[in-house]
UniProtKB/Swiss-Prot annotation:
EC number(s) on file: 1.3.-.-
Protein's name in the database: Digeranylgeranylglycerophospholipid reductase 1
Function according to Swiss-Prot or TrEMBL: Is involved in the reduction of 2,3-digeranylgeranylglycerophospholipids (unsaturated archaeols) into 2,3-diphytanylglycerophospholipids (saturated archaeols) in the biosynthesis of archaeal membrane lipids. Catalyzes the formation of archaetidic acid (2,3-di-O-phytanyl-sn-glyceryl phosphate) from 2,3-di-O-geranylgeranylglyceryl phosphate (DGGGP) via the hydrogenation of each double bond of the isoprenoid chains.
Organism: Methanothermobacter thermautotrophicus (strain ATCC 29096 / DSM 1053 / JCM 10044 / NBRC 100330 / Delta H) (Methanobacterium thermoautotrophicum)
Catalyses which reaction(s): a 2,3-bis-O-phytanyl-sn-glycerol 1-phospholipid + 8 A = a 2,3-bis-O-(geranylgeranyl)-sn-glycerol 1-phospholipid + 8 AH2; 2,3-bis-O-(phytanyl)-sn-glycerol 1-phosphate + 8 A = 2,3-bis-O-(geranylgeranyl)-sn-glycerol 1-phosphate + 8 AH2; CDP-2,3-bis-O-(geranylgeranyl)-sn-glycerol + 8 AH2 = CDP-2,3-bis-O-(phytanyl)-sn-glycerol + 8 A; archaetidylserine + 8 AH2 = 2,3-bis-O-phytanyl-sn-glycero-3-phospho-L-serine + 8 A
Record has Oxidoreductase as a keyword: yes
Entry keyword Flavoprotein: yes
Signal sequence region: none
């Protein structure tokens, strides 16, 4: 049997936002790029909905497109276990991290289209089944529609999600410990009665052990209703907690599900190594996720952009060693890693709080004046109202 061999400068495995961004910037840098994804349709099945900040999109040079935006947010409502709520809306405070709710299926596909327009080739329903080191890169075994073939690449970029097989094949340990893997479950629901359809709602405490629950408005009476939990904090599955939350939350008590999504988020920060000879790891595969919010689209895409730029330069220079690719890791630590490390400390602190302590913080927030609201500003206010938080987090913020 004759095995076809395709040769490329850069092979990106996984066409999520991080992988597509890596492919785009490697192609813009002049590299011959191939982007492969195991799914027959990029973006499907839908990942859990997520918000992105306007500033985050701008930093990546991405113009908002109404095709992949379901809602522009005007604020947040945070609800403690006893129902005490804190409203932070754009009519009262500045929201520098305000942004959009994405239609992930469409957004992911559009990011892949951007990669194609930049010059990257794309193959769908194509799975990498193994790879071996060569003198100047990797030989990757792949399969598409039952046809086996090989791809010879100077650089492989692993964007294949949490528990990356590609990184493992290259000898990198990117495995996520159970205590750092958040299990998530989400319904898209109709008949949701939110207090403000332009605000995202967060619910904290034992409703979602180790994480939080949220209602994300999409329009009219439609919302994504989901939560994330840590298996080390509960004996129940994320789905079981979701069913309980839907029954207990006034906004969703009379709503009906039309779609269910299940997934996982690595919330333990980036692994010690992101590169090896001829290999870089990006996105969820690299733990480029905010441990506090579980959001990883913008941070993963920033990682993808840096990886693509470094890959193109390395190929052009004829040096694809780990030392040369280490520029990507250094830039990631500077531009993404410091923030991830800070928010990991905040998450670890929040895990120590009981429901009654969360209620006390929410009640203290009732008397706090906010001029602007961002994740960092919220933590700073938390430090002001909680002596325990000051002791644990004061030096970080």
């Amino acid at each position: 049997m004759i095995i076809m061999v395709t040769e490329v400068d850069v092979l990106v495995i996984g066409a999520g936002p991080a992988g597509s961004t890596a492919a785009k910037h490697a192609a813009l840098g002049g590299a011959d790029v191939l982007l492969i994804d195991k799914k027959s349709e990029i973006g499907a099945p839908k990942r859990c909905a997520e918000g992105v900040s306007i500033g985050g999109l701008e930093s990546l040079g991405i113009e908002p497109n109404p095709r992949w935006i379901t809602k522009k947010l005007d604020g947040v409502r945070m609800v403690s276990p006893n129902g005490t709520d804190v409203w932070l809306t754009s009519d009262k405070v500045e929201l520098p991290e305000a942004g959009y709710i994405l239609e992930r299926k469409v957004f992911d596909k559009f990011m892949a289209m951007d990669a194609a327009r930049a010059g990257s080739r794309i193959m769908v329903k194509t799975i990498a089944t193994g790879m071996e080191r060569t003198d100047d890169g990797y030989l990757v075994s792949a399969e598409c529609m039952g046809e086996k073939f090989e791809i010879k690449a100077r650089i492989v970029i692993a964007a294949d999600g949490p528990e990356s097989r590609v990184a493992r094949w290259a000898g990198l340990n990117t495995a996520t410990r159970p205590k750092d893997m958040e299990s998530a479950a989400q319904f898209e629901m109709v008949g949701v009665e939110m207090e403000d359809n332009n605000c995202i709602e967060f619910y904290f405490g034992s409703v979602a052990p180790g994480g939080y629950a949220l209602d994300i408005p999409e329009g009219d009476d439609i919302a994504n209703v989901g939560l994330g939990v840590l298996s080390t904090e509960t004996d129940k599955s994320a789905y079981e907690h979701l069913l309980e939350f839907v029954e207990s939350c006034p906004a969703t008590r009379n709503a009906q599900p039309v779609e269910l999504n299940i997934g996982g988020d690595p919330v333990g920060g980036m692994p010690k190594k992101l590169v090896a000879d001829s290999l870089m790891v990006v996105g969820d595969a690299a733990g480029q996720v905010n441990p506090l919010t579980g959001g990883g689209i913008i941070s993963g895409m920033k990682g993808g952009m840096l990886a693509g730029q470094v890959a193109a330069a390395a190929v052009s220079e004829g040096d694809v060693t780990a030392r040369r690719l280490g520029e990507y890791e250094r830039l990631c630590r500077e531009e993404i890693g410091d923030e991830i490390s800070k928010y990991l400390k905040v998450k670890e602190y929040l895990l120590t709080l009981s429901d009654s302590e969360l209620d006390s913080i929410a009640e203290a927030f009732q008397d706090v004046e906010f001029e602007k609201v961002s994740t960092t500003e919220l933590v700073k206010k938390l430090i002001k109202v909680s002596p325990k938080a000051l002791l644990k987090l004061g030096k970080l913020f």
